[in-house]
Amino acid sequence: MSSMIHSTTIALLSGGLDSATAAALAVEAGQKVIGLSFDYGQRHRKELQAADALAAHMGLSEHHVISVNLGSWGGSSLTDLTQTVPSEGVVDGVIPNTYVPGRNTVFIAIGLSLAEARNANQLVLGINAMDYSGYPDCRPDYLRAYQSLADLANKAGREGHGIKLWAPLIDWNKKQIVQEALRLGVPIDKTWSCYSGGDHACGICDSCRIRDAALSEAGRSDLCSKSTP
């Protein structure tokens, strides 16, 4: 979780506001940033289209989209169309059905592989405080444990210059992330946060509601709820 600056950074780019802001911080720091996105069997293509647009906007040197079909075995409303995406909000202490089993563990592992292949020293993640209340693989202790594993599991770590997992937004709420995105010039209109598919954001899923509240506080009018016909 180090914020140490290195010459090359791999950015896990989902297409959402959080990962876009994290990637933009690496770009601002003067890094050569390589984007990495995943087609993991999610409900829709909108977030991958957003990731591609964001990578182009930020001028990333490379943008890889890797197919890892976590939807093959379901286990989440984001990959299993027979499950309903909840609209009632997150219940404290309950992991929502939007949690995708093992998703971040798999994504970070592939990110570390790309980082080694490109001699990158850093992996930047958009994980933040709004995530780890519900998702076990978004918590600070998870990242610390993964960092220890990464230092043991790859050549760079064994040689004493391990690849750092950088989560610059880890203690931030969504309002702070929106404010930082605006400062960095992140094209918020190009990001996609909605859990559901369709031409327009649903405006009612938990992701849309959290995003809308933060955008509204920041004085923005481009709300998910207003994009719904």
From Swiss-Prot:
Annotated cofactor note: Binds 1 zinc ion per subunit.
Organism: Prochlorococcus marinus (strain MIT 9313)
Job description of the protein: Catalyzes the ATP-dependent conversion of 7-carboxy-7-deazaguanine (CDG) to 7-cyano-7-deazaguanine (preQ(0)).
Gene symbol of the encoding locus: queC
E.C. number: 6.3.4.20
Pathway(s) of this molecule: Purine metabolism; 7-cyano-7-deazaguanine biosynthesis
Lineage of the organism: Bacteria, Bacillati, Cyanobacteriota, Cyanophyceae, Synechococcales
Keyword hit for Transport: no
Protein name: 7-cyano-7-deazaguanine synthase
Alphabetized GO MF terms: ATP binding; ligase activity, forming carbon-nitrogen bonds; zinc ion binding
Similarity remark: Belongs to the QueC family.
